[in-house]
């Protein structure tokens, strides 16, 4: 009887492993490898350019790459639109459990990408948080390096959406202080305008709240 029990239990675990492996294959097959590879190849070409550039040239390469990379990401998201729009739809073949989500991101991490929940069921494929920092940190000027370091940390956690504030007000205040210090340190930086926009966003959220959840009752802006 003991032997039979072991055999049955082993069979159950074996079956679950087969089902799990099949599900993993189906998830990976949902992705268009060609558009993902184009993202990787573009990154490789940029890294080669950086190896022979000075710091000011590297700053320009970053700005160019940021623009072209957004177009590639738009294409990636368009290619996977049906999939992304139905991740939360339990009646869809694209519906993801928490385990499915982890499986998909484990695969996408090979391309330095991840599926990110922008909150309120809006889902996109984006770069991993430290993507640009890791590529450019050893090549760009000090202000660009620090800017990328700040944004990489911010990208690790969504602070707010139109519907709600997702972190404590202390974190909002810390974010504002970080950008104010950046502007004091690099007042003439090419990135000063972007940093100032970040400051204004943090100020607005801290004082007024998010668009759909203002801190002043009845006051939307």
Residues covered by each model-derived region:
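Short solvent-exposed coil/turn linkers within tandem alpha-helical repeat scaffolds
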Residues: 134-142, 182-194
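Amphipathic alpha-helices of TPR/Sel1-like and other helical repeat/solenoid scaffolds
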Residues: 172-185
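Sec-dependent N-terminal signal peptides of Gram-positive bacterial secreted proteins and lipoproteins
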Residues: 1-17
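N-terminal Sec/ER secretory leader and immediately downstream segment
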Residues: 23-128
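Solvent-exposed, acidic/flexible segments
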Residues: 97, 101, 125, 129, ...
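Short coil/linker segments at helix-helix boundaries
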Residues: 131-132, 145-173, 205-221
């Amino acid at each position: 009887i003991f032997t039979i029990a072991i055999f049955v239990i082993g069979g159950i675990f074996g079956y679950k492993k087969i089902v799990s492996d099949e599900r993993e294959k189906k998830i990976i097959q949902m992705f268009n490898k060609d558009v993902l590879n184009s993202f990787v190849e573009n990154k490789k070409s940029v890294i080669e350019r950086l190896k022979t550039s000075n710091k000011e040239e590297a700053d320009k390469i970053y700005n160019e790459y940021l623009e072209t990379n957004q177009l590639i990401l738009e294409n990636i998201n368009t290619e996977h639109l049906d999939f992304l729009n139905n991740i939360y739809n339990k009646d869809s073949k694209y519906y993801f459990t928490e385990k499915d989500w982890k499986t998909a991101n484990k695969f996408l991490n090979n391309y330095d990408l991840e599926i990110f929940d922008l909150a309120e069921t809006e889902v996109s494929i984006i770069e991993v948080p430290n993507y640009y920092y890791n590529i450019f940190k050893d090549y760009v000027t000090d202000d660009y390096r620090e800017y990328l370091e700040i944004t990489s940390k911010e990208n690790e956690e969504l602070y707010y959406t139109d519907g709600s504030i997702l972190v404590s007000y202390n974190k909002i205040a810390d974010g504002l202080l970080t950008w104010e210090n950046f502007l004091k340190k690099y007042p003439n930086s090419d990135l000063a305008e972007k940093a100032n926009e970040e400051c204004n966003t943090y100020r607005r959220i801290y004082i007024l709240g998010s668009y759909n959840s203002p801190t002043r009752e009845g006051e939307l802006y």
